[in-house]
Amino acid sequence: LLAKKMIEAGACAIQIENQVSDEKQCGHQDGKVTVPHSDFLAKINAVRYAFLELGIPNGIIVARTDSLGAGLTKQIAVTNEPGDLGDQYNSYLDCEEISAEELKNGDVIIKREGKLLRPKRLASNLFQFRAGTGEDRCVLDCITSLQNGADMIWIETEKPHVGQIKAMVDRIRDVIPNAKLVYNNSPSFNWTLNFRQQVFDKWTEEGKDTSAYDRDNLMSADYDDSELGNEADKMISSFQKDGSAHAGIFHHLITLPTYHTAALSTDNLAKGYFSREESMLAYVKGIQREEIRQGIACVKHQNMAGSDIGDNHKEYFAGDAALKASGEDNTMNQFNL
């Protein structure tokens, strides 16, 4: 029903993810909990049917997996036979082998290959995956999603690293050769630090002298114009191109960049405006003059608020008696350059 409402409102693409809905976290935070594949695939099918019922045969479904950083599941998957999808999901659980005599009241037990296994269950009643299984789970998530109606996949990673992304996409494309990846160039990453560390580690492996750099302090402004800093910036500037060329990224997106631009510009304006050195010049030089030079329409903020449209309405209904805002005394005329 929600998907249909979104489509009716104009959505041509819908992204869904494999986290539980009631305890969902940001994809770059800890404490993520995933659902078994049967639950996730049911959602994909529901979205596809919503598109089809509304007469849209080419609606886009993006299936996102948060499994790389998710160490928990809310439930054990239903499995009917060894090797089925539920059994594969459960195979990643952190279990201990026990005997029938070791069973305790309320224990949840899995039988696999003739063994009794007790999954590690937390006080929250969530079950824990084995450490180091994130990439394997991501690959399985993506393959099954594409096989069951998704058009594109989205893997949420903990760092922007072309090699890591490529390794997973290559495995997916072994099964789905035309798999297309959506990637989030997220502000949640510290891009400067990540790429400086990548350069530092690469140079170390190559035997290059890195004694001039402190790996634990690579965010220092002292390195902004250094050879390492410049090399990291080159890698950042080519990340999208490299990701598409080598890691199968079909669509690059960036989440909430305007949140950060608004915060930074407001902070800078406040500091300058209330300083003795700049005062009003902070706004004029840093904002208004640049709006004029770059032809930003918002410099005429009255127009952007609809004053010209209001004048049209006034003139239509009142004719010559209309009191229009766009007369010669309107200061907005100062921007008609």
Regions of interest found by a model, annotated:
Residues 192, 260-261:
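A SIS-like phosphosugar-recognition module
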Residues 276-287:
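Polybasic, proline/glycine-rich intrinsically disordered low-complexity segments
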Residues 254-259:
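Short acidic/histidine-rich active-site segments
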Residues 1-253, 267, 271, 307-337:
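Alpha/beta enzyme core
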